[in-house]
Regions:
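Cofactor- and metal-binding active-site motifs of prokaryotic enzymes
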Residues: 1-155
Length: 155
């Protein structure tokens, strides 16, 4: 059964915020397979990730920044000094393959490459049940077409 937790922090220190999010998000998870992090642009992102990794170890971290706020089960979280939120997923049954790439010259080919790499990390050629992608605006559709070339219709 899929297990997940959501956490957040408004600590002023980037490292402390990342660590606090991770500590709360991994509670009762058997093995953290992936963590999604969304944070304020006010944080030093490298320090935030260092804090999170100090708890998560080698679990992949995916995410991006927000200039305004994040939404968690408790409501909208925002702070002038910074904010971060994390969704951690981990259980015995879930397999997660994470891959990334620089933009490249051909977004569709980049999408294919990333899809193949993520599937290889899981050790399967079976299409995933879920695909999550973060890309700069403008070429997302071409990345998705490349992913679909490999996995079929993107779930």
């Amino acid at each position: 059964m899929l297990k997940s937790n959501v956490s957040y922090s408004t600590d002023k220190d980037s490292f402390t915020a990342g660590k606090a999010c991770a500590e709360k998000a991994v509670v009762d998870l058997i093995e953290t397979k992936v963590a999604f992090v969304f944070s304020s642009v006010k944080y030093n992102q490298n320090k935030l990730l260092e804090g999170a990794k100090s708890v998560l170890g080698t679990a992949p971290i995916i995410g991006c920044t927000s200039s305004g706020a994040i939404i968690v089960p408790a409501g909208v979280v925002s702070s002038e000094s910074g904010f971060a939120g994390m969704l951690a997923i981990g259980d015995d049954e879930t397999a997660v393959g994470v891959a990334g790439s620089e933009r490249g010259k051909n977004p569709r080919e980049t999408g294919k490459k990333v899809a193949k790499e993520a599937m290889a990390k899981v050790g399967t050629d079976k299409a995933p049940a879920y695909v999550y992608m973060i890309a700069s605006p403008g070429e997302e559709e071409e990345y998705v077409k490349g992913i679909e070339d490999v996995v079929g219709c993107v779930p």
